[in-house]
Regions:
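Alpha-helical transmembrane-bundle signature of multi-pass membrane transport and export proteins
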Residues: 1-414
Length: 414
C-alpha cells in the first residue's frame, strides 16, 4: 500500500492538480460512453468492418490534420480557456447525436466524430502541456502517471458501463451522459486557480512558422525523437487492434455491445493499473523509467498474440488487460520523458505533434485493419500485430539503451 501514498498525497494536497485530474476523469468517461454505442450503431447499419473502423479513424484523424494549429494555440493562448471551450463544444456535439435517427445514414455520426476529435485535438496538448505548471518537478512522475491513468480508469469504467448502459437503457441516454461529462469537466477546469503556462515573451511568427521551432527541437534532441517514435509505432499497432474490438465481439464472440464494452473496459483497466505497477517496480530513476519503455511494448505484443488465440470473451478480455498494462506504461513513461525534456515555450506544440502522430497512426491502422478484416480472419490479424510489437519493442530497447545510460533522477536535454 505504501507505493500508492505519493498518488494520494498529491491528489489530497494539490487542489489545482486535483481539479485537472477530475476533469480528465469525467471527460474521458463521456468519451467511452460515446464510442462504444457508435461502433455498434454503425456496424449494425452497414454490416461493414471498415465502416465501424471509420468511427475510430474519424475521432483520431483531426488531431493529425490540425497539428500546425493546435500546438501553437496551446502555447500562444490561455490553456484554461482552451480546455473549457473544447469541453463545451464537445458537449453540444454529443447532444446533436440525439438526431442521428432523424437525419439517417452513417455520414452524420462520422461527421460528429470528426468534430469531436477536433475538440480533443485542442484539449490534449493544452492539458498535457499545463501539467508541469501545476506540480513541482519532483511530483511530475507521479502526476504524469495519474493523469495518464485517468484515461485508463475511465476507459475501463466508461467503456464497460457504456456498452451495458446502451444495451439495457438506450444509446441516446449514453449520448446525453457524454454531454453532461464534458460540461462537468469544463466546470472543474474553470475552478483551477494557478496559471496553466509559464510567463514568457510573445511567440512570433505564423502558426506554421512557429511550429518549425518544435520540429527543430525534436530533430536536435535524439532522446525526444526516440520517445516520439515509440509512441507513434505503438499507436500504429494498438489502433489497429482496438479497431477490431467491435467486430470481434459482434461476429466472433457473439457478445454484442456489452462484449465490445468489456474489451474496451479491459483495455482501460490495463492502462490504469499498468503505469502505477511499473513505476512502483522501476522507481524514480529516469534511466530505469525510460529504459523500460521498449519492454512495455514487448509485453503488449506478447499479450495480443494470446488475444488472437482466445476462444472466449473472458480470456480475450484478460489478455487485453495484460496487453494494455504494457501499453499504458509505454504511453505514460514516454509522456513523462517528453515533459522532462521540453521547455515550456514549445511544450504545447510538441505535445500537439505527439498527439497528431499518434492519432494519424491510429487512423491509418484502424482503416487498414478494417479493410483487411473484410477478407482476412480476425485472429491472424491480431497475432500479426502482436508479433510486430514484439520485434519493434526489442529493437527499440537495444538501440536506445545508450541514450538513457547517464540519466538518474534529472533528465538533461540532449
Amino acid at each position: 500500500m505504501t507505493s500508492f501514498r505519493p498518488y494520494w498525497d498529491l491528489i489530497q494536497h494539490n487542489a489545482d492538480f486535483r481539479r485537472l485530474y477530475l476533469a480528465r476523469l469525467v471527460s474521458f468517461a463521456g468519451d467511452w460512453f460515446l464510442v462504444v454505442p457508435l461502433l455498434g450503431l454503425v456496424y449494425e447499419a452497414t454490416d461493414s468492418a471498415l465502416a465501424a473502423s471509420a468511427v475510430l479513424a474519424a475521432q483520431a484523424l483531426p488531431a493529425a490534420l490540425l497539428v500546425p494549429l493546435t500546438g501553437a494555440v496551446s502555447d500562444r493562448f490561455d490553456r484554461k480557456k482552451i480546455l473549457i471551450i473544447s469541453d463545451l463544444l464537445r458537449a453540444g456535439l454529443a447532444l446533436s447525436l440525439l438526431a442521428v435517427d432523424a437525419v439517417g445514414g452513417v455520414w452524420f455520426p462520422l461527421l460528429i466524430m470528426l468534430l469531436e476529435g477536433a475538440g480533443a485535438a485542442f484539449f490534449y496538448p493544452a492539458s498535457t502541456g499545463a501539467l508541469p505548471n501545476v506540480v513541482d518537478e519532483q511530483e511530475l512522475p507521479v502526476a504524469t502517471t495519474l493523469m495518464s491513468s485517468a484515461w485508463g480508469t475511465m476507459a475501463a469504467v466508461g467503456a464497460a458501463t457504456g456498452g451495458v448502459f446502451a444495451t439495457l437503457v438506450s444509446r441516446d441516454a449514453a449520448f446525453v451522459l457524454n454531454a453532461v461529462s464534458f460540461a462537468l469537466s469544463a466546470l472543474l477546469v474553470g475552478r483551477v486557480v494557478q496559471n496553466l503556462q509559464a510567463a514568457r515573451k510573445p511567440i512570433g511568427g505564423a502558426g506554421r512558422e512557429s511550429n518549425r521551432d518544435a520540429f527543430r527541437y525534436i530533430f536536435s534532441h535524439v532522446r525526444a525523437l526516440a520517445l516520439l517514435s515509440s509512441k507513434g509505432v505503438h499507436s500504429l499497432t494498438s489502433g489497429g487492434a482496438v479497431a477490431l474490438f467491435a467486430l470481434m465481439s459482434i461476429t466472433l464472440l457473439e457478445t454484442g455491445d456489452a462484449g465490445t464494452g468489456a474489451l474496451f473496459g479491459a483495455r482501460g483497466l490495463g492502462n490504469m493499473i499498468g503505469p502505477i505497477v511499473a513505476l512502483a517496480i522501476v522507481g524514480r530513476s529516469n534511466r530505469r523509467i525510460l529504459g523500460s519503455i521498449g519492454w512495455a511494448m514487448t509485453v503488449w505484443g506478447v499479450a495480443y498474440i494470446f488475444v488472437g488465440f482466445s476462444p472466449t470473451l473472458l480470456l480475450a478480455a484478460a489478455a487485453v488487460c495484460v496487453a494494455h498494462m504494457g501499453g499504458g506504461t509505454q504511453f505514460t513513461f514516454s509522456t513523462y520523458g517528453l515533459q522532462e525534456l521540453m521547455p515550456d515555450d514549445v511544450r504545447g506544440r510538441i505535445f500537439a505533434l505527439d498527439f497528431g502522430i499518434d492519432m494519424m497512426a491510429i487512423s491509418i491502422s484502424a482503416l487498414i485493419l478494417g479493410a483487411l478484416a473484410q477478407t482476412v480472419a480476425i485472429r491472424p490479424l491480431l497475432i500479426g500485430l502482436g508479433l510486430v510489437a514484439v520485434v519493434f519493442g526489442l529493437a527499440w530497447t537495444t538501440l536506445t539503451r545508450p541514450l538513457w545510460a547517464d540519466l538518474e533522477t534529472a533528465t538533461d536535454e540532449g
